[in-house]
């Protein structure tokens, strides 16, 4: 206990209140098998159907590159030796040459030779965002069902109520990211030679920072609502712009300049890049340090704003 009031009532410590409320949230989630199955099926469908069907590397295969048996080259296109009237190239050999260039083109564009590995990490980031936001939505049901009022009438700290929601969202995001990475590996995710199990700690740290920031601000938005439709519309409004204005599914350097500017301030860009650096790309310590610096500043700023706003709502 943290102390005794004038009436002799024991006030639970912040840690005990935090544990009790977090345990309640996780227990509800783990006891709902339908929700657990859906959380696994959703990324599996994205990776199994969309990830495998978007075989961008296959565009460079010899079977796809269609060239005539003979490819004439005019003389004015030949620099050396000079004076040739023209040459005729073997179309099949030329197609094989282009196919051999495919992995290099893919690595130059995506950093990896297969698009599935690139996209699988993007799906991890996407699921982290959606899980974090939807986890904060449970506070709307707590308010509608009267549970929030009951908790607020007890000696439990208001901070424990807020931190429990944030911790629940973060733990769920980490759990789902682990499941998605395991499924992606089974489906063909190619890990970098520099990958070690310790890299997973960095992955969890990056997910933790983004989840804390997003869940804090989303809880502050949802805590004032008694209708579930409002936060659901909010999630639908910002999820797609966050995903498609980041590097989750497409490299930022191939985007238009105005979208590159948007991606440069999108926190999802830095989460995705950090996870890729730690899993499928050769480790770039400078880039990774910048990713964590941005995510840390993002988490600190949004967590401060979100917690202060939620605190004011609970204490007024």
Question: What is the predicted function of each stretch?
Answer:
Residues 2-3, 57, 279-283, 292-316:
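Junction motif at the cytosolic side of a transmembrane helix
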Residues 2-23, 214, 258-269:
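Short, membrane-interfacial amphipathic segments enriched in basic
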Residues 23-42, 289, 315-316:
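Membrane-interface helix starts
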Residues 31-59, 96, 117-131, 176, ...:
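Hydrophobic alpha-helical transmembrane segments of multi-pass membrane transport/permease proteins
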Residues 48-60, 222-265, 269:
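Transmembrane helix segments
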Residues 72-99, 108-187, 218-219, 237, ...:
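Hydrophobic alpha-helical transmembrane segments of multi-pass membrane transport proteins
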Residues 85, 103-114, 194, 243-301:
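Membrane-interfacial helix-loop-helix junctions in multi-pass membrane proteins
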Residues 158-235, 285-307:
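Alpha-helical transmembrane segments and their short interhelical loops
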């Amino acid at each position: 206990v943290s102390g005794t009031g004038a009436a002799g009532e024991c006030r639970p410590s912040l840690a005990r209140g935090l544990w009790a409320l977090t345990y309640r949230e996780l227990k509800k989630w783990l006891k709902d098998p339908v929700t657990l199955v859906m959380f696994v099926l959703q990324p599996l469908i994205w990776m199994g159907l969309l990830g495998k069907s978007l075989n961008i590397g296959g565009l460079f295969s010899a079977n796809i590159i269609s060239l005539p048996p003979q490819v004439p080259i005019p003389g004015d296109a030949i620099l050396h030796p000079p004076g040739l009237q023209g040459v005729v190239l073997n179309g099949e050999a030329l197609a094989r040459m282009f196919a051999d260039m495919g992995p290099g083109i893919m690595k130059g564009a995506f950093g990896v030779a297969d698009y599935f590995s690139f996209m699988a990490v993007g799906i991890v980031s996407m699921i982290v965002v959606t899980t974090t936001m939807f986890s904060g939505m449970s506070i709307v049901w707590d308010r509608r069902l009267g549970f929030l009022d009951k908790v607020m009438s007890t000696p439990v700290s208001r901070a424990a109520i807020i931190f429990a929601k944030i911790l629940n969202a973060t733990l769920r995001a980490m759990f789902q990211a682990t499941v998605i990475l395991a499924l992606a590996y089974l489906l063909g995710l190619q890990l970098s030679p520099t990958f070690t199990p310790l890299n997973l700690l960095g992955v969890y740290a990056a997910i933790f920072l983004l989840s804390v920031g997003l869940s804090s601000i989303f809880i502050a938005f949802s805590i004032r609502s008694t209708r579930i439709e409002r936060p659901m519309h909010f999630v639908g409004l910002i999820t797609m712009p966050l995903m498609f204005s980041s590097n989750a599914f497409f490299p930022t350097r191939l985007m238009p300049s105005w979208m590159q500017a948007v991606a440069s301030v999108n926190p999802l860009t830095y989460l995705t890049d950090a996870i890729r650096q730690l899993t499928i790309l050769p480790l770039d310590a400078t880039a990774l340090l910048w990713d964590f610096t941005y995510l840390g500043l993002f988490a600190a700023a949004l967590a401060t704003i979100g917690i202060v706003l939620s605190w004011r709502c609970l204490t007024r």
